[in-house]
Amino acid sequence: MTYVNPSLQRAIAQRWKLVDSLRPLPPEVVASLGKVFRTEFTYNTNALEGNTLTLRETQLILEEGQTVGGKSLREVYEARNHPEAIGYVESLASDARRLSVSDVLTLHQIVMKDAAGPGRTGVLRRGEVRISGSRHVPPPAYEVPRLMDALVDDINDNPDERTTVEQAAVVLHGLVHVHPFYDGNGRVARLLANLVLMRRRYQPIVVLKQDRRRYLTCLEKADAGDLRPICAFVAQYELKHLDMVLRAVEQTPGARLLSLEEAAERASTSAGYLRLLANKGYIPAVKDGRGWAIAEGDLDAYARARRKRRAPKRPR
């Protein structure tokens, strides 16, 4: 079963092929993108979990080692730990060996070092947990080891032959669903999703704090058995990050971003309708910080397909 709309999947495949044809990327581009990613990923992944550090405060901690007045040590540790965690994921991505549950435990230990309670880093939970604000009740602790073995096997073998983006989304939801740790589950899940992407030469993604409500809604729908929203969510972010690479190396044919209002005028439709399609993952739109946007080339492809569907069929 395919979980990502074909038009969105085609846009990702086209960008991926172009990025892959440009490898190796210029070292200065890799360094610049890596620096931005580390800061923005660290800020957003922690902010999604309630950390109150600003983007600028996060940058000061990462780049200058400064402490920040008025913030808890836990919040500072959560920021400080992430560059090492990202580096660990990068090393796993370049390693051909099979991922193990031990690797996931090591990742959790790095992420939550000094930020979680004693004896709660790098170990699976031994008690029951609840997810604040969610109707989902994680499985009992005695099932967690078996479920984690199954999740890691799924990462290694992809038995359902999902696309890379779909596999990343399923892994992201899978770890949050199992909730194997007392704390840090969302952070580790987003890092593992990026590991799946990076192992197959896709770009790691940053889920924005502003997208928290949509993100949680997608996870809730996945809990209920509908994986399409979370797969579309991850796919839209992957498209955005592939475009960021192409803009960095100035290889962006037809990639000028249009607001949905501009796009609606060009496509002779309404911005509300395009927004509905974007929210459902039916068009290759991305969140650009201000709202939804779509690349000119993707809009033109959508408009052509729309005209083709509406064209009267020739009589036989």
Q: Which stretches of residues belong to each language-model region?
A:
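FIC/Doc superfamily catalytic core
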Residues: M1-D183, R187-R316
